[in-house]
């Protein structure tokens, strides 16, 4: 059974693939099969993924307000995907903020460049503070 962390890694992969080929969703099942995401975890993954896509404009507008010199579209694909996942969980789910931040930082350490964890932490922390 996949862990929640592995599920979030899969969501990042799905968002990345979506940006490269949004016209064809055939990649969804391929990615989930490859990462052995099944049953309840597959449902959790798809709920996160579709929730992000359904709220993408709102998420991006919110994130843009916390990006000083950049727009979300100017960031790298991986950083953008991690921020979108984190923002979605903070804005639309009951996942505790500390877990969202920790997961986003860990994903950034694993998948993005060396400066990304600090950057992602700063943006999501600002979002949490503004939400209070």
From Swiss-Prot:
GO terms for cellular component: cytosol. It comes from Campylobacter jejuni subsp. jejuni serotype O:23/36 (strain 81-176). Involved in transcription antitermination. Required for transcription of ribosomal RNA (rRNA) genes. Binds specifically to the boxA antiterminator sequence of the ribosomal RNA (rrn) operons. This is Transcription antitermination protein NusB. NCBIfam families: nusB. InterPro entries: NusB-like_sf (IPR035926), NusB_fam (IPR011605), NusB_RsmB_TIM44 (IPR006027). Gene3D superfamilies: NusB-like. GO terms for biological process: DNA-templated transcription termination; transcription antitermination. Belongs to the NusB family. The keyword Transcription regulation applies. Keywords: RNA-binding, Transcription, Transcription antitermination, Transcription regulation. The keyword Chloroplast does not apply. One of its GO terms (molecular function) is RNA binding.
